[in-house]
Amino acid sequence: MFIRTFPSARVLARVSLANVLHVWQGLGYNRRAKYLHEAAKTINDKYNKYNKRFPDTVEEIETLPGVGHYTARAVAAFAFNKPEVFVETNIRTVFFYHLGPRRKLSDQQLLPLVERALAQSRMEPREFYAALMDYGAHLKRQGIKLNAKSAHYKKQSAFEGSTRQVRGAILRELLKHHSTLATLMQRIPRNQQDVANELSRLMAEGLVALHGRYFAIQE
């Protein structure tokens, strides 16, 4: 649905953030949709700087909003078939499953192993990573959950009753219409301080703006 609606960076850059968030619903953190929207605008605005349709080096990709070290390498590998090395949750699962480490390992310890496996593979980089991630997802579907062996592992809190739930509720209301603080507090069945706190955070992140007495999705 998202790709069908916004098939290119140029199309995505020309729509409002509210439009992006509406289509993004159910696809994950709304902050990521905002970063993607901003990245599309950056690519569109700096077309002449890159002298091509899309930045294709890790260094260029890392300049895009919200793109970090590993994400830039994942984009380079999948979009441009470059032999960049990165680790994500399903890749960790595969290596932990076959290594069976007795102690927790960091991504820095896993990266040389991924690099060696990629170099020895007869597959193209994008095929290698697609297969690796599909395999990791398959292991998880079989009930094999090993990410606790990662030195970076943090157990995610339950969604029910979380601040993530409050943020989602606020954005859903504001996608329908502009609202005052009093209206939001009335419509969202949570502690009023929680609603106020998350509104402040959403404003700080550039997802929500205040126009007089009314809150709205940032334009």
What are these regions (language model features)?
Residues S162-R167, A216-Q218:
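Accessory DNA-binding and partner-docking regions appended to nucleic-acid-acting proteins
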Residues L174:
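Core nucleotide-handling region used for phosphoryl-transfer chemistry
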Residues M1-Q165, H177-H178, M185-Q193:
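Catalytic cores of DNA base-excision repair glycosylases
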Residues V75, N197-R201, A216-Q218:
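Residues in the recognition helix of alpha-helical DNA-binding motifs
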Residues P189-M203:
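Short amphipathic alpha-helical interaction segments
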Residues M203-F215:
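A short, conserved structural fragment
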